[in-house]
Amino acid sequence: IYSFDGILISLHGHSPHWQKNIIKIKDEERGEVVTWKNGDKTLFLNDDLPRHFPIKESSPPNISNFSPESIPEEINFIPVSQGLEFFFDLEHKYDIFDLIKKGAGDKYSIHGEVTSPFDYLLNLFGIERAMVYLVQEPSKSKEILQRYTGGVKKIALEQTQHNIDAIKISSPYAGAGFISPAFYKEFVLPYEAQIARVVRDRGVHVYTHTCGAIDDRLEMMVEAGISGIECLDPPPLGDVLLDDAKKRIGDRIFIKGNIDPVNVLLLGTEEIVRKDAEFRIEVGKPGGGFILSTACSIAPHTKRENVQVLRRVAENIN
């Protein structure tokens, strides 16, 4: 339909028997509500990420009496969003990689994904409390980050054994909307750099996905030893100007993104999308290292025709 040339495996470890855990599915105007055997409910929205409602709310731990050693060496879940944790079926941890490779062959670029240790920290304590702990308990926060880093590295290394072309480090909370450049350098960079290093040592490319405003930390992101950066949201969603980013870091890593997924792709006409895509290619193409893409995810209500324009523009410009 869209002629994309890559497949991102953002979740893995699906149980082949997951449907057996469902008690009831109820259709609502906003989407489907699934009730699970343990009593939890998940609202699968028509136009947004799922929202999970556990039957019993659990309070996050307090860092003062939390032991970093209590974090298992082998991480068994992905902190997806809004408190939802996706747990692996350890007997089928990477089945999806092999299934996709079998179906796609060498026709598509296949990417795995791991989550930044910083996200695991935020998931553990809750975003607001975790941010406070960075100020109040920086040393212990780093111990926890290092513990999670070990587990994420293990997942990344396991993914490299499944014929993938690259691994994405999902790090959506590491932009200027959440932390300063100084905090990025202290609490994000050292840990993502460790992940990048072990992946690159396996001969697999690795790139970082950070949403929003990242103009003030582009060079620091490159210091992690990554192969590329994804998103580079332009104003007003972010603050990255493609020509400036290209001059500053384009000779060291690849750049993927910079098309506004809201104001251009969702709200724009086909002509607006065409002109914007042509501009991004004109700026990004010289010297290579630019991948035409939306800055972040495509909004659910985006017209199919607008997305299809991107492929036509890429083919016409060659």
Where do the PLM segments sit?
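Catalytic domains of carbohydrate-active enzymes, especially glycoside hydrolases
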Residues: 1-10, 158-165
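A contiguous, low-structure linker/loop signature
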Residues: 13-81, 106-107
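Active-site loop segments of alpha/beta catalytic cores
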Residues: 55-318
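Short active-site-adjacent helix-start/loop capping segments
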Residues: 8, 15-20, 120-121
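A structural signal for short, well-ordered beta-strand segments and their strand-loop junctions
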Residues: 6-11, 109-113
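Generic hydrophobic, aliphatic-rich segments that mediate packing or membrane embedding
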Residues: 3, 28, 93-96
